[in-house]
Amino acid sequence: MNLGIILPLIIYLTFVFGAAIFAYVKRTKGDFLTEYYVGNRSMTGFVLAMTTASTYASASSFVGGPGAAYKYGLGWVLLAMIQVPVVWLALGALGKKFALLSRETNALTINDLFFYRYKNKYLVWLSSLALLLAFFAAMTVQFIGGARLLETTIGISYTQALLLFALTVGIYTFIGGFRAVVLTDTIQGTVMIFGTIILLIGTIYALGGVESAVNKLTEIDPDLVTPYGPNGMLDFQFMASFWILVCFGVVGLPHTAVRCMAFKDSKALHRGMLIGTIVLSIIMLGMHLAGALGRAVIPNLTVSDQVIPTLMIKVLPPIVAGIFLAAPMSAIMSTIDAQLIQSSSIFVKDLYLSAKPEAAKNEKKVSYFSSIITLILTALLIFAALNPPDMIIWLNLFAFGGLEAAFLWVIVLGIYWDKANAYGALSSMIIGLGSYILLTQLGIKLFNFHQIVPSLVFGLIAFLVGNKLGERRIEKTQLKVTAL
């Protein structure tokens, strides 16, 4: 166990817990629900940018994505840059409308907005179930990614690393709530930027420059330096599918959408869009390029997801590697804490308080219940992550796709189409998510596109058809009422 690596990590985690304690103090002075779930809607532009980019740049950006770049070469780096406009697109499409609606209705969760917009409790229940299932899969990926990092860098077993990571995330989310999440996201986003730059420079330096690195990759496999990767796998259908899955479809991710309910004002939104796009550009290019070039430094890795932690040890001095370890840890922690908060809000706000609204008056009990739910979820995730796959990116993309198939049209058409109704939303959610799971489990790719593409098409058709049928049913009901 190398103290040079561990010491900076301990210092960093001290800052994280400090932020959580600060958030806890703030929480005790305000309304619990508003403070715990949306940080009293007080995010500045810089904080909004960092928390949105940090939440998006998860284990896949720092572990799974570079692992795929290690395996498939520079073509995957090009593919990864598709994700650059994500912050601009998500905040631009949802920002102002979500902010206005959430303030007007005092909404704290995505389901609050769904109930206000569609006036249907069954939609909220189905939404809650879909969210919990998809978040559980997505959070499992983050736990695996965090454990992989600690396992490789500080030399402990995978199980020990998993327990250490889970303990850290569970405790500071338990203490601090949403404000702790966005404060640590801001710290983490800054660490991510510098860590990415340092590792990329260290990798290129170890290889004797970019030209030398590319030559070494060519010697290993000439396909590693082509845009299409080994066996031409990165074809048009793959790239188009990937763009929909990790860029356009991100508008339908609820834990990204909830950020649009918590910023301070329009100035914060516009600044957040600009800064967030710059931050994501640096992270995506730097980490994936480091992963691809890492093949020339360490050509014989059996688990490609270990490329970043192995590179850290190989090309950086121990103290610098320790500082950089905080970067991917930051990315993973910032994603999982956001999803833990969202999952907790589903149980507490959308299910418990909707069934017992009078319980909201007892803030101490609600606070206790929220924290207990967070700890139970953390414990369940530990069990789910005990047997990890070799490449976590596919599991993460599966969770991404599930959320998008269920929620993209419900969110977008709900805020941009006045005639959208609950029948259309329910139809879209059931058909979109159902077809995605079915196509994925059966391994069916229509016209060689990823399953998310036909699922979104089916979901849109279902929304339009369900909406039309719903209009007729609503008209019949109105006629019966007026005839009385």
From Swiss-Prot:
A cellular component term, taken from the record's GO annotations: plasma membrane
Coiled coil: none
Compartments, record wording: Cell inner membrane
Record InterPro entries: Na/Glc_symporter_sf, Na/pantothenate_symporter, Na/solute_symporter, Na/solute_symporter_CS, Sodium:Solute_Symporter
Keywords linked to the UniProt accession: Cell inner membrane, Cell membrane, Ion transport, Membrane, Sodium, Sodium transport, Symport, Transmembrane, Transmembrane helix, Transport
Domain of life: Bacteria
GO biological process: pantothenate transmembrane transport; sodium ion export across plasma membrane
Keyword field contains DNA-binding: no
Reactions mediated catalytically: (R)-pantothenate(in) + Na(+)(in) = (R)-pantothenate(out) + Na(+)(out)
Membrane-topology descriptor: Multi-pass membrane protein
Family that this chain belongs to: Belongs to the sodium:solute symporter (SSF) (TC 2.A.21) family.
Main function: Catalyzes the sodium-dependent uptake of extracellular pantothenate.
UniProt protein name: Sodium/pantothenate symporter
Organism: Haemophilus influenzae (strain ATCC 51907 / DSM 11121 / KW20 / Rd)
Chain's gene name: panF
